[in-house]
Amino acid sequence: IKKIWYGDVITSAVTKTSLKTWLGTATEVENSHQNTWLYTEDDPTYTDYINELNGDIYYRDVTQKGAKTITFTMGVFSFDDKVDLQGGEKVDTDAGWAASDTPGIVNKAIVGQTKTGNYIVFTNAAVIAKGNAVEKNIGLGVTAVAMENPSAGVKSDYMFDGEKVDAA
């Protein structure tokens, strides 16, 4: 991974120009701990229909899309990052962090730029962040799952050619 950003949920269809603008307003993750970045797309759930006469599959019905997930651990982070991604609140301005009284999911847009330059965009990700032991430290582990976007015409996720976004 080259770069990671997070910010407010994206509420309009993403184009190369709007993505470049959004990146300028988003928070850039300054540190992703070694070997913690991962993008996965689960296989969809499906039902196979079998022809009794010969035992072959004659139709496959996709019943549920597979989840798309980005995970990484911030090895260095601020209390602002922790509040933004995990919830809770800062204590004594910037002296510490206090957990939320109720568990919950934080919704954010998450964008990753791959080493080849392409952008993976989750417009409305359900983010769960937690303390994550890495080496001799506690990092901020982030799991973001692409969710349906509540805004009409906005897809849950996009992928863009990095050169075209950067040139916009």
PLM feature spans:
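Mixed-charge, glycine-accented linear interaction segment located at domain edges/termini
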Residues: 117-168
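Solvent-exposed edge beta-strands and adjacent loop segments
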Residues: 1-82, 123-137
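Acidic surface patches and DE-rich sequence motifs
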Residues: 51-52, 114, 149
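Charged, amphipathic alpha-helical segments
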Residues: 75-99
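Acidic-leaning, charged glycine-interspersed low-complexity segments
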Residues: 96-131
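Intrinsic-disorder/low-complexity loop/linker signature
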Residues: 24, 88, 116-117, 162
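Low-complexity, polar-biased intrinsically disordered regions enriched in Pro/Ser/Thr/Gly
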Residues: 15-23, 91-100
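Beta-strand secondary-structure signal
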Residues: 69-73, 109-111, 141-145
